[in-house]
Amino acid sequence: HNIVFSNSNYEQMARCTFDLIYDYNPLFVINVGGCNPIADLCNNITTVCCMPCINKPALSTSSIYIRYFPYTEDDDRIYNDLLLNYQHVYDMPFVEELSGSNGCIQVKSDYGIDEDKFAIIIAGNRLDKEIRQRFIQLLNDISSPEDNVVFVFIGDCPLLKNTLKDCDFYNKCVFTGAVSNFKGAVSIGDLFLNPPRQGGSTGAYYAIECGIPVLTLPSCDVASVGNAFTCHTIDEMSDIIHRYMHDSEYMNQQIQNCRSSFKKICSCKDNLPSITSFISKLKEYMNNGGR
């Protein structure tokens, strides 16, 4: 089923969705993303597992959280500190799109970009809300001394596009809009630049798979690709990017870090055993009276 919600029919569709799940009487429900009142209502009829797409627990009344990304001991402690007493977290590493992505690799000329340009990828579905003035200033700082740079915005962002029209570097911007081959679009880049935000990890994983270094703050979800791709503050990013552009030895080292980081991430992504293990733990939890 693919149920389409809108502001005009939300209550009606919510009731239909709940009734549909009730009639199916499933063993459990997985809520991808979190912050879903319909999924929370389903806690009254079955076990609901919340799988956030960020590295922190999303707001949910579910008793089970599913975590699918790599984490450190400190990450685990912080994650569990944010849970309520009745909530538990189970790991289910599952990033099938990394190894099984069907998108073909693309080139810069597919988007009207000269192949000798240094393409900085900025990707996401919420760029209109995520790009703040400080990040725009960063783009200006990057572009001011560089004639050879181009910023490639992947995803619909009409408000951001309108805002950047008044910026001196607007002629160095390319807006792809929504793309059917996300990995292919990311693959044209020389660097994946992550604005301060939650989410964005899929694009970063695609980047390192393609040997494209990532630059992000350590507090962002994208930092899960590895410490080699983080910096402490946004003020450092401009100098680091200029180093990527002009220090080939540094760039080559970071490309090697992409390969080792991607190999490490994918080494634990054997999906079937991961899913089987999660189901076994969930059934044990439910057999012991949990919901």
Predicted regions and their residues:
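Short acidic alpha-helix that forms the nucleotide-activated donor recognition element
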Residues: 18-19, 23-24, 178-190, 209
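Acidic donor-binding loop of glycosyltransferase active sites
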Residues: 24-28, 187-200, 212
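Active-site-proximal region of nucleotide-activated glycan assembly enzymes
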Residues: 45-102
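Catalytic binding pocket for nucleotide-activated donors in carbohydrate/polymer assembly enzymes
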Residues: 78, 195-263
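Conserved active-site histidine-acidic residue motif and adjacent donor-binding/catalytic loop
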Residues: 8-13, 157-159, 173-186, 199-200
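A charged, aromatic-enriched C-terminal amphipathic alpha-helix characteristic of glycosyltransferases
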Residues: 246-287
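Conserved catalytic-core segment of nucleotide-activated headgroup transferases in glycan assembly
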Residues: 73, 84-166, 175
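Active-site and donor-binding regions of nucleotide-sugar-utilizing enzymes
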Residues: 1-59
